[in-house]
Amino acid sequence: MYYCYLRAKRNELLAIRDCAEKIKSANISIILEPVRKNLTELITCFNSILDSDDSSNLVYILNPIVGDLSNNQFDIIEQANQITKQFHNITLGIIVDQRTDYSQVEYWISLFPGNSFVLIHFGEIPNPNTINNIPQIISNIFYSGHVSDNYISLFTKNKILLEDCFNRLNRNYDYQHSMVEFFSDRHLNYRNYGFQGFANFSTIGDYYAEGGTQPYTTAFHLTFNNEQNAVINIRHWLSDPRTYREPISILNEELLEDIYNMINQNSSLLAWSSACNELVQYHNLNNYSYSLGTLKRLSVRHHFELMAHLKDIGIY
């Protein structure tokens, strides 16, 4: 099973809503880390992907480590209470690491005794054997590179491997040196390593920032499967390099022309990628006024659609 870890910003939530039916049909699960108090947006998103009798395809994290809520326990609990009132059996997540005490895990579970829980291991919690005895914990998600194989072996319940597959560079311009890169092959081999699921941070990576300045160069990132060996690669498109800022519409026009040419050469994408179809529409209408957030939304949406497509054709 594929799990997608996202921070709950507006465009990420829109990408989920855009792809709700494909997410459900492909049995994709969302791990959602709230970053601000945005209950209305969250509820709207949840309504699109959760069934009234089954909320197992979403993990809502109770203790975010980035964003406005990371140090605001009152708002975290208040928002979580509102969510669990509407989605009674939603799965809740707890981020744990080497600083986490067993009593902290017990505390979160005591607040929501009727829910199932998933632990997201961003480090190695002391005395992990005690965790195996908590019946409400149904799965463990292990962040690769942050925990050891020996630590993972101590857990007996459902195991998911989380990886950051996106090679984030400091400047968009830097992607010119490697326009096509390996992204992941975990969908092909996760069971061989003893995992019941695999997870990543989509085409955003384990990165969080609020706002930001307008870039000199815009970038768009698109995942695709290599038809020779079924691994997933990622391609980067850039607007023309420059040393001064210009209106986003000018950068988007340069960027979109190259993307459109690629889609024309790989027209089979249009059969399953609504994100690529939307990009074609922008090109045909000479519409270049969309925001950088829209590019991110389309990139994330396309990745959902790719994973659903690979599931449909039996790749994993």
Over which residues does each language-model region extend?
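Short acidic, S/G/P-rich loop/turn micro-motifs used as interaction or catalytic elements
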Residues: N11, P34-T40, P64-L69, D97-S103, ...
